[in-house]
From Swiss-Prot:
Its main location: cytoplasm. One of its GO terms (cellular component) is nucleus. Belongs to the IUNH family. It is an enzyme of class 3 (hydrolase). This is Uridine nucleosidase. It comes from Saccharomyces cerevisiae (strain ATCC 204508 / S288c) (Baker's yeast). Gene3D superfamilies: Ribonucleoside hydrolase-like. The gene is URH1. It is found in: Cytoplasm; Nucleus. CDD domains: nuc_hydro_IU_UC_XIUA. Keywords: Cytoplasm, Glycosidase, Hydrolase, Nucleus. The active site is at residue 254. Its EC number is 3.2.2.3. It catalyses: uridine + H2O = D-ribose + uracil. The keyword Thylakoid does not apply.
Length: 340
């Protein structure tokens, strides 16, 4: 096991599953969460900003993690949100979220803040994206010299072989679909694509918050208000996923899956424990707004797994390991929570 923590920047659009990514970033012992940027996506950007600050307040991390407002809209098209899945606020389903006790930082732009974090952790920092890729693509478009200084870019997005939840043919995943132009900017960049890790729906659909998972989160012995908050978020998420996408056993908790490969690749835990299986591919997506398959992932080329070329596309994971990391982080968060 490595001694040093893994420096990460999280760009997210909270979002029920983003909430768990924030929990892991804050409280998993492996991660040093340097900052959060919030983008449009699951809800309008003013909501995702508020939600991130509310979650950090609830977890006792107010002002400990700087929050910046990231990309506010897609590069070329009109924004789309997901109230049918996440509710109007982006975090519907609980009344336990507190009013944030701090504001988003305005001392610098999100581009400057991310630049500063990358340069301070040159060659070691990883960027985790659990929403649209607009924030990161904008950073690299404005400051392309930063590309060489990021170790990994871990992305929750896309679906292989036409698996999706958006567009008329349901062949695109939401995060890619809402800004495929920004996604292609990352996927097609020869300086970036080989350090990208993509966890697609094909993998995240295995990370189901079942009834048994809910019992581990909140039970007679572990019944804090913070745990109740996460239980209520999961229960709301379960209802919307059952109603809108037919998930009977519970909702898929997509976003925190993007953090798991980093635990293996930085040497925090062995591959035998993490169980991350992947293929290396060059990918792109259909970015024509008028195409019925807009946002669909296209596999351009496949490489041998032992190659250092091609985007790392996740296929499988030790799901028990995944939940164990979340339970450990929640145990730690319990001790700092401001809501009981």
């Amino acid at each position: 096991m490595t001694v040093s923590k893994i420096p990460i920047w999280l760009d997210c659009d909270p979002g029920h599953d983003d909430a768990i990514a924030i929990l892991l970033g804050c409280f998993h012992p492996a991660f040093n969460l340097l900052g959060i940027s919030t983008c449009f996506g699951n809800a309008p950007p003013e909501n995702t900003d508020y939600n991130a600050r509310s979650l950090l307040t609830a977890m006792g991390k107010a002002q400990a993690i700087p929050v910046y407002k990231g990309a506010q809209r897609p590069w070329k098209r009109e924004p789309h949100y997901a109230p049918d899945i996440h509710g109007i606020s982006g975090l519907d389903g609980t009344s336990l979220l507190p009013k944030p006790t701090f504001e988003a930082r305005t001392d610098k732009t999100y581009i400057e803040a991310i630049e500063e974090a990358i340069l301070a952790n040159n060659g070691e920092i990883s960027f985790v994206s659990t929403g649209a890729l607009t924030t990161l693509a904008t950073v690299f478009r404005c400051k392309p010299y930063l590309k060489k200084s990021v170790k990994y870019i871990s992305i929750m997005g896309g679906g292989l072989h036409g698996l999706g939840n958006c567009n008329p043919n349901l062949s695109a995943e939401f995060n890619v679909w809402i800004d495929p132009d920004a996604a292609n900017y990352i996927f097609r960049d020869p300086d970036v694509k080989d350090k990208c890790i993509v966890v697609p729906l094909n993998l995240t659909h295995k990370a189901i918050a079942t009834y048994k998972v809910n019992e581990m989160i909140y039970n007679e012995k572990n019944n804090s208000k913070l745990r109740e908050l996460f239980l209520e978020l999961f229960q709301f998420f379960a209802h919307t996923y059952k109603d809108m996408q037919g998930f009977e056993s519970g909702p898929p908790i997509h976003d925190p899956v993007a953090l798991m490969p980093l635990l293996e690749f930085y040497g925090w835990d062995p591959s035998s424990a993490v169980g991350f299986r992947y293929k290396r591919m060059d990918i792109s997506c259909i970015d024509d707004v008028f195409n019925e398959n807009s946002g669909k992932i296209i596999i351009e080329k496949e490489y041998p797994n032992d190659s250092d070329v091609g985007t790392i596309i996740g296929l499988d994971l030790n799901i028990q390991y995944f939940w164990d990391q979340i339970f450990e982080a929640l145990n730690r968060a319990d001790k700092m929570s401001t809501i009981g």
